[in-house]
Amino acid sequence: MESMFEDDISILTQEALGPSEVWLDGPGDPSLGGDMCSASHFALITAYGDIKERLGGLERENATLRRRLKVYEIKYPLITDFGEEHGFPLYEIKDGSLLEVEKVSLQQRLNQFQHELQKNKEQEEQLGEMIQAYEKLCVEKSDLETELGEMRALVETHLRQICGLEKQLQQQQGLRDAAFSSLSPPAVPATACPDLDLHYLALRGGPALGHAGWPGPTSVSVSELERRRLEEALEAAQGEARGAQLREEQLQAECERLQGELKQLQETRAQDLASNQSECGMAWVKRVGDDQVNLALAYTELTEELGRLRELSSLQGRILRTLLQEQARNAGQRHSPLSQRHSPAPACPSPSPPARPPPCAPCQSPAAQRRSPVPPCPSPQQRRSPASPSCPSPVPQRRSPVPPSCQSPSPQRRSPVPPSCPAPQPRPPPPPGERTLAERAYAKPPSHHAKAGFQGRRSYSELAEGAAYAAASPAWLQAEAATLPKPRAYGGELYGPGRPLSPRRAFEGIRLRFEKQPSEEEEWAMPASPPSPEASTIRCASFCAGFPIPESPAATAYAHAEHAQSWPSINLLMETVGSDIRSCPLCQLGFPVGYPDDALIKHIDSHLENSKI
């Protein structure tokens, strides 16, 4: 487009017009003035130049836009509605190649600039090093200048001393000259006796004449002496300077030696500190190892104590179950006539739910009995309803929800419908010298043994052995003082989430003191039956059956057992050591003397936790 408007300005000039053509508003036209023609011509030329410049700028912008559009079309080809790609002519490909060439050239220039930048960085580093070296040289130069100034000051002092000595020498020489001049006599005229005068002059004026006429030997000797004296002073000053240099060298050597000793001392000190730190680290490791060994020994001892406690608990549970089964058989034999009267048809259906499994055999292990949903020992509900499931009961107001496996051993709480069992065979009481294994296991320990166990051991199950209580009397076995303790699971496995609900589980949250109530005695009492001589022992066994029995060590690991460590609970427990009946000092709940101390302390801990003490 620039070529189109390149020479169009010639149409406004006179040369572009033909010889026969004349401007309408030219200067030769008499109808228009000269000033007006020139002004209009200049305005037209200016406007045409502006228009041409604008058109050139627009053309350049259009070319740039076309070039960019071509680049975009090459990068992102357009697809028509018919699915065909838009074809580009050959000049567009040429423009792309030109762009590639420009890109390569720009990349080369960029690499060149980067190379120059790297060179500039290296030069800057070299310049920095040179500046540092120059600074070091400047520092050394300043040091040398200071040393030179000191030497100059020293030389000036020596020169001043030499000048002073020379002045003193000149003064002394002047004084000597004055003394010699005062000693010489004035001139005397000639006399008749010239020989005497000559002789006198020879005798008295010899030195003066010699001093005045020519330099005598005295002046020469004085100058020699002064020179020698000055040389000696100069040599002495040089010797002092050499001595000062030697002392300086000696002091420098001493300083270097002291610096070496200081470095050696620092190294030895660092080595000593490192060795001390290593020794301290080894001592700390040894101390930690000893602590771990002591902790492992204490853990082992505590595990053994807990194992012995669980073995004792399982032994007591087996003894209690065997005792309860014996008492149940005896009670069933005593109540058999009444059950035969009230249940003539023994094959009638039982009112209890048929989905209950049969009771477990008495010879099962403690673990199996704990897992069984129907425990062989009677619960408090079974004591309230001792009717056997195999016989129909005409009084259905007190039915047991779970069919018990044995009759309740309490004679004061007998059901009006006893089971079909043979006649009771009363057993005579045992002699006082013979003691059952249950009485030995639940005998009350002496108070001093219990206190010694609390003070000397971390595990409070030391006195749970049955042999330690063999000499104690079962004074706590009283029917009026029987209570039901709060059952607690050992390790969370006694009543797991997968175990079925048992009568003992139903009575977990109920604290019940089984005392004689008038309504119950009127309802359940049977005046025809004589009181059993073994009432206290049976009541003790049924009462102890409500306590949780810890599992054996083989059943669960020690990690599930919680050890009581609360000292307030221990102090509260120590208050009940000397009493006849072990009871909780907070809720007055009675416990057997042989009940584990750890479980009792945990019971007190539950009160303290609930009250947030």
Swiss-Prot record:
Compositional bias ranges of the Pro residues kind: 346-361, 389-406, 416-433
GO cellular component terms given for this protein: cytoplasm
Start and end residues of each stretch annotated as Interaction with TBK1 and IKBKE: 281-330
Record keywords: Coiled coil, Immunity, Innate immunity, Metal-binding, Phosphoprotein, Zinc, Zinc-finger
Modification type Phosphoserine: residues: S184, S365, S372, S379, S385, S400, S415, S502, S532
Coiled-coil region: 48-162, 218-277
Biased composition (Low complexity): 362-372
Binding of Zn(2+), residues: C584, C587, H603, H607
One BP annotation, GO: innate immune response
Stretches the record annotates as Homodimerization: 1-280
GO MF annotations in UniProt: zinc ion binding
Residue ranges, annotated region (Disordered): 328-457
InterPro entries: CALCOCO1/2_Zn_UBZ1, TBD, TBK1-IKBKE_adapters
Zn finger region (UBZ1-type): 581-607
Free-text function comment from the UniProt entry: Adapter protein which constitutively binds TBK1 and IKBKE playing a role in antiviral innate immunity. Essential for the efficient induction of IRF-dependent transcription following infection with Sendai virus.
Subunit description: Homodimer. May form a heterodimer with NAP1. Interacts with TKB1 and IKBKE. Weakly interacts with DDX3X.
Protein name stated in the entry: TANK-binding kinase 1-binding protein 1
Organism (species): Rattus norvegicus (Rat)
